[in-house]
Amino acid sequence: MAQKDVLTDLNKVRNIGIMAHIDAGKTTTTERILYYTGVNYKIGETHDGASTTDWMEQEQERGITITSAAVTCFWNDNQINIIDTPGHVDFTVEVERSLRVLDGAVAVFDGKEGVEPQSEQVWRQADKYDVPRICFVNKMDKLGADFYFTVRTIEERLGATPLVIQLPIGAENDFIGIIDLVEMKAKVWRGETALGEKYEVEDIPAELADKADEYRTKLLEAVAETDEALLEKYFGGEELTVEEIKGAIRKLTVNSELYPVLCGSAFKNKGVQPMLDAVVDYLPSPLDVESVQGHVPNKEDELITRKPSVDEPFSALAFKIAVHPFFGKLTYVRVYSGTVESGSQVINSTKGKKERLGKLFQMHANKENPVERASAGHIYAVIGLKDTTTGDTLSDANQQIVLESMTFPDPVIEVAIEPKTKSDQEKLGTAIQKLAEEDPTFKVHLDQETGQTVIGGMGELHLDILVDRMRREFKVEANVGKPQVAYRETIKRKVEKVEFTHKKQTGGSGQFAKVLIDLEPFSGEDGATYEFENKVTGGRIPREYIPSVDAGAQDAMQYGVLAGYPLVNVKVTLLDGAYHEVDSSEMAFKVAGSQVLKKAAQAAQPVILEPIMAVEVTTPEDYMGEVIGDLNSRRGQIQAMEERAGARVVKAQVPLSEMFGYVGDLRSKTQGRANYSMVFDSYAEVPANVSKEIIAKATGQ
């Protein structure tokens, strides 16, 4: 078997991803690739819920891909490592981390829909990491499929320059094959060839000859411009050889100047093998990618590089963690330089901790092929790493390097989750810890006010699936609340000399404490939200009781005076008071401190504050009006508008409470072509009418 040479000759290796909109047929395409490369003996269909890379139960049920499974396969003695990435907006973290470790990608488009919003978003993420791509126009057998329309949308919506290297023969039900513009031959799948393994190479059909010539000329012009020798040859009227054309297309693709466009129907098994040839012919090998940059641990200015060679010191990036039913934690790594054997010790240079590599596997979706050593340019799954999380670098202990990590957005939506029984409580803890290891965008905190566990994520679908996984993989039964907003309360004016006397003198030891305070709005340095100042003179209140007044005031602040939300940004000044030799105690002054704060706050114009989000919507020009109108109706304030890669970007500040369900509304208003991101910006006062509703809801009136 030629697998041995592949491990040493990196020219024959391709690390690629398959990226696309949610329904363009990524997973079906991946399945076909695995079938033709001989890894699978039975074709799995997304329709039947049996595809190889969708190995979580929910993926098979929902027919979408959530996690990126890494699969290794061979094609004409070349090794292709494929990462199947999800196309749904809530799983951007999966897409980001796959793109970070890929050398190239196949962008799959739906031949009827053209470039869809999710494709725009994933395309922009690929631009961010500068990943070379080839485009595969899929579903050419579908009603209404239009190859030329799709190519136009690649130009218009993505602002990219497509290079058409194949044309379809027929369309919809009559789609029977492709014209290869490089070799100027037709490749035809006749009849219902059971699995499309056999195709005939024929002359181009007469009725398509003109169209083929027109596109061939465009192709040759683009190719000739890459090199002066080719340019002279082309204008001198000489034929360019197939090798010369392929070499030039490869150069253009690797430099991300142009994106070759192919077509086919993965489901009908047409056009997949030529697409595999294109992956090998045009996408970069690990050697085409420049050496990776990193820095010395703890010294970010000292840059070092590692070349993609086995002779360099070992370095690798952990890009994904998955929980495996038998092995526990699997860490997926991309090795950038050097080699390492299973069982050796390496260092996690991001955290400065030693790690021992247990077993090493090359993965095939969820079957594992054990290997003895990991070497540069490949992707592996490792067992036995304890402290390594997504984005960490593993390196040779004597020659450490920290590679550039990945950036993950903060959660935008939170729900409270309560275990149904005591035994679920313990399981929930384990489940949350495991899921947080796998998914850096999943965050958890304990709500001090309600004692509930609150989980946060990238969107409603994201949280649905996480809760679903808790139920399935960890057998946790839990009730999930509605998405919540964290309000706060504060005061707007200063009140002076508010007095409160706490006394209880009916038989036995009594209680007595008298306090006098000023209360005023306050905003401290470095975000402090409370200050207590003592101005009592002449021992009017004994020293030991003063901290009790402070503690009482802080207790009262936890449940404000309007709707029970925490009171923030206040300053308490203790001016005067009185005590009783026998009846005063710490307890008495604590009660007095608490009551006087409530009394003062009620007089100081209390208001409710709400979290305001900075929202950024990227939309095609045609939907600008709808998007802006919709944001205004959500009490949003438009801050700015700009243009970016053929799309419009609207920036606005919108209260979080108005943003629930926005994903769905935005999709329906823009036919799914817009997308948005939001991050927390600040707290701001709630308008009076909204404030009334919040108070009524909280006090049950």
Swiss-Prot record:
Transmembrane segments: none annotated. InterPro entries: EFG_II (IPR041095), EFG_III (IPR009022), EFG_III/V (IPR035647), EFG_IV (IPR047872), EFG_V (IPR035649), EFG_V-like (IPR000640), EFTu-like_2 (IPR004161), G_TR_CS (IPR031157). Its main location: cytoplasm. One of its GO terms (molecular function) is translation elongation factor activity. One of its GO terms (biological process) is ribosome disassembly. It is found in: Cytoplasm. PROSITE patterns: G_TR_1 (PS00301), G_TR_2 (PS51722). Disulfide bonds: none annotated. PANTHER family: RIBOSOME-RELEASING FACTOR 2, MITOCHONDRIAL (PTHR43261:SF1), TRANSLATION ELONGATION FACTOR G-RELATED (PTHR43261). Catalyzes the GTP-dependent ribosomal translocation step during translation elongation. During this step, the ribosome changes from the pre-translocational (PRE) to the post-translocational (POST) state as the newly formed A-site-bound peptidyl-tRNA and P-site-bound deacylated tRNA move to the P and E sites, respectively. Catalyzes the coordinated movement of the two tRNA molecules, the mRNA and conformational changes in the ribosome. NCBIfam families: EF-G, PRK12740.1-5, small_GTP. This is Elongation factor G. It comes from Mycobacterium sp. (strain KMS).
